[in-house]
Amino acid sequence: MSGGRDIKKAVCRHYEIREAALSKSRRSVENEARDLAIYLLRYVRGERLEKIGEEFNLSNYSSVSNAISRVKRRLHNHKFKKLYGKIYDSLF
């Protein structure tokens, strides 16, 4: 099973961003890469919402829950689901 750092690296590699970009949070600006990393940490690693929030500098665990909900909605989009599959497969 992949660690949290491996998940972050895989997401950053696919989105071609630096890991620091995952921790940047700006009000009303979506960060698809961060949301996906959060989702993977929750469902691949089984991390607690509070711990994930700490890793991404999110002060409220409900922000983590909202990110997970956004990914669940996006997974209905074929292109996003394909991207998710590539990243997920690269972890194992």
Which role fits each region the language model picked out?
Residues 1-36, 40-92:
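Basic, alpha-helical nucleic-acid-binding regions used in initiation and control of genome expression
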